[in-house]
Structure formats: structure tokens, C-alpha cells
């Protein structure tokens, strides 16, 4: 792995080069487009196409990147954002020890190791911050993502039945968590 000022140079399992780097406030629009593309697939994100405008989502993302209690990593290839991971931490005393992880990867960059690298980056940040837990929610039929999370040490905590409505159908949410103190060093 080569560390550059703009991030860590990586190679996908299919040989394509990409870079892992911290998110920048200027990534807001590119990340909003990535989310819109994945949202249009209709399977992986809870919001429906058109539910959020690109400018408002770009603004919200920029604010998260600036916030001290969140972390955004970006996967970039040929100048395009092809994936990201976000960890946000609530400021409330009761939950300030927990980071909530969300991840999004462009369809043509899945299954090449980017998800594993993004999750590992989130785990490193959680350790540095002294978090006791990373949690996430995933649709139970997203077997590919679940396999990545389990390989990275996440465990299944439960299922919230009929948690989300999507295209007039109700979908369950699988809750997963990773505990740094219980994890072996990766």
C-alpha cells in the first residue's frame, strides 16, 4: 500500500487501482450522486429515488464531513467517488460510546475488496476514538454485505421486522454490531 498526500493507493481484487482517503466537504455532490445511483437500484438503501434532493443531500454530507463526531472515508477511482463509509456518533451521554456505520459502493465496484477496506477504516477510527461499539442495519437479503461485515468481525444482534416500507412492501432490518474490545487485531 502506498500512502500519498491524497490518500492510500489500493488495488482492487480485479486489478483496478483506487484510492482510500478521508472525505472532504467538497465531496458532497459526488457522494449524493453515488447515493442516488445506488438508491435507483431499489434494493439497498431505505430512501426511495427522488425522496431527497441532490443539493440538500450534498449539503448534509458536507456537514457530516466537517463534524467532529463523524468520520467519512471515500473510495475514489479515476477521479470518481465509487464508495464511502460514514460513522456517526451521537452526542448524547447515553449513546456517545456507539458509532453508527453506513456504507455505499457503486455497483461496478462491488465484490473487489473496497467494502472490506472501508469497514476496516471505520473500525480503525472507532478504536482511535475509544468507541465501545459500531452498529449498523442491513437488509437481510443483502447477503454480500452481511458476509463482508461478518468477515470483519460484526455479529448479528437481532432483526427489526417490517422496519421499512419500500415499494409498498415491508422490509426487515438485520442489526449487526462490532465490539473493539472483543475483536482480535486485524
What are these regions (language model features)?
Residues 1-14:
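Short acidic N-proximal helix/loop "leader" segments that mark the beginning
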Residues 19, 42-50:
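A short gly/proline-enriched turn/hairpin at secondary-structure junctions
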Amino acid at each position: 500500500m502506498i500512502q500519498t498526500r491524497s490518500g492510500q493507493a489500493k488495488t482492487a481484487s480485479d486489478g483496478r487501482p483506487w484510492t482510500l482517503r478521508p472525505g472532504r466537504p467538497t465531496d458532497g455532490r459526488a457522494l449524493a450522486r453515488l447515493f442516488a445511483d445506488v438508491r435507483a437500484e431499489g434494493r439497498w438503501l431505505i430512501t426511495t429515488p427522488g425522496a431527497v434532493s441532490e443539493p440538500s443531500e450534498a449539503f448534509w454530507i458536507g456537514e457530516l464531513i466537517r463534524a467532529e463526531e463523524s468520520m467519512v472515508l471515500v473510495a475514489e477511482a479515476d477521479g470518481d467517488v465509487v464508495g464511502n463509509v460514514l460513522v456517526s456518533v451521537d452526542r448524547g451521554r447515553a449513546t456517545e460510546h456507539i458509532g453508527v456505520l453506513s456504507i455505499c459502493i457503486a455497483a461496478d465496484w462491488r465484490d473487489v475488496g473496497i467494502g472490506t477496506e472501508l469497514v476496516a477504516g471505520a473500525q480503525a477510527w472507532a478504536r482511535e476514538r475509544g468507541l465501545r461499539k459500531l452498529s449498523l442495519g442491513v437488509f437481510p437479503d443483502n447477503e454480500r454485505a452481511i458476509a463482508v461485515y461478518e468477515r470483519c468481525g460484526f455479529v448479528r444482534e437481532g432483526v427489526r421486522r417490517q422496519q421499512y416500507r419500500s415499494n409498498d412492501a415491508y422490509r426487515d432490518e438485520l442489526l449487526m454490531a462490532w465490539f473493539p474490545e472483543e475483536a482480535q487485531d486485524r
